[in-house]
Regions:
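Bacterial N-terminal signal peptides that target proteins for export
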Residues: 1-9
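A sequence/structural signal for flexible, mid-protein segments enriched
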Residues: 23-350
Length: 350
């Protein structure tokens, strides 16, 4: 396995909500060719699936002219349709006269991104409200962008969902999930804590994080948290039965300090944390790898859209298990470590 530091949650945000625009009209003088730019991530735990669809142009004209024109970025309402056909087997798609199990239809909606990178006003996004059973890891999903006027396919791609955790054992092995009744706690007594988990089908890149909980001393019902990222892990073989990473004490405490140092409230210790796991499939892993290489001169952006550019991939972003956190009173126990951060924890209130 290969470890790297990367949070693909950021990439996902850019994929779905990423571009700004202006109001000029598109009148390039050079020859050009229009192609769709399509981004979609499937997660069976999402209540809504989004497709980001834009137009991009290939040609020899001025890049600033091509890239800065609002009217050139989006297809007008009613010009294209977006749908996902669901097949029991990938081979069925090439069988003459075969029909999918069902079809997921998308509606065009205007959405705002009001803060952060690429903040902008209303932009069109294609949405489908997921119904129970529609997203099944056993099926193959075929994304289609079609021109309404003649029904022709402009862009297409296929993917499968990531697998589900084992029904009996789950995905997290250590520390012990509270739901499983195990005895291995999340602790820093040895200077680090090992996180161990079972791979899921078609998972290739795993990004764990620790959700550190705390309460305000005078608001005991105010459960709050700070997310602490861990090293990402790549799965390099389907034969691997266990993946692992380590949460280093110095990194963990430093991240807590940075996230809480501006909060002057008196805080209380909570004796549990959550282990959260974000997972990417091979397509998303390849795309992330190409994005991280963009700071060099020679790179090739990953693309799996037939007839266009972009990405159709699968992820898991909702895997979370609560575990017991050690609160030992010894000098290297969490009581003393938190108090020494000087961010509002006190030994007699922990």
């Amino acid at each position: 396995m290969i470890k790297q530091k990367f949070s693909f949650a950021v990439v996902v945000t850019v994929l779905l909500l990423g571009l700004t625009s202006c109001d000029d009209e598109f009148t390039p003088n050079a020859e050009w060719r229009e192609i769709p730019s399509v981004f979609c991530l499937l997660d069976q735990d999402d209540d809504t699936t989004y497709v980001r669809l834009q137009r991009c142009y290939l040609g020899d004209g001025n890049l600033y002219s091509y890239g800065s024109v609002a009217d050139s970025l989006y297809y007008p309402a009613g010009e294209v349709e977006v749908l996902i056909r669901v097949w029991r087997n990938a081979s069925d798609m090439s069988v003459s006269g075969a029909t999918p199990i069902y079809v997921l239809n998308f509606t065009r909606e205007m959405r705002d991104k009001v803060e952060g990178s690429f903040a902008s006003g209303p932009q069109p996004v294609y949405c489908h409200r997921n119904m129970p059973g529609e997203l099944d890891s056993a099926y193959t999903y075929e994304l289609l962008v079609r021109r309404v006027s003649d029904g022709s396919t402009m862009a297409s791609a296929t993917t499968r969902l990531l697998g589900d955790p084992d029904n009996t054992y789950g995905w997290l092995k250590s520390p012990s999930p509270l739901s499983g009744g195990g005895v291995v706690t999340f602790n820093m007594l040895s200077g680090s804590c090992q996180i161990k988990w079972r791979p899921i089908d078609r998972g290739r890149l795993y990004q764990p994080r620790i959700r550190f909980y705390y309460r305000y001393r005078f608001l005991p019902d105010s459960l709050r948290y700070a997310d602490i990222p861990c090293d990402a892990v790549k799965q390099t073989s389907t034969q691997i039965l266990e993946l692992t990473t380590a949460v280093i004490k110095e990194h963990y405490l430093n991240e807590i300090r940075k996230k809480l140092e501006s909060d002057t409230n008196h805080k209380k210790f909570v004796d549990t944390v959550s282990v959260i796991m974000d997972v990417a499939d091979e397509n998303l892993n390849a795309y992330i790898s190409s994005v991280t290489a963009m700071d060099g001169q020679d790179y090739q952006s990953y693309n799996n859209i037939v007839g266009g550019v972009g990405l159709f991939a699968a992820r898991r972003a909702h895997l979370m298990e609560r575990v017991r956190s050690d609160k030992g009173d010894q000098p290297n126990g969490m009581h003393s470590l938190l108090e020494n951060l000087n961010v509002g924890f006190q030994q007699n209130d922990l």
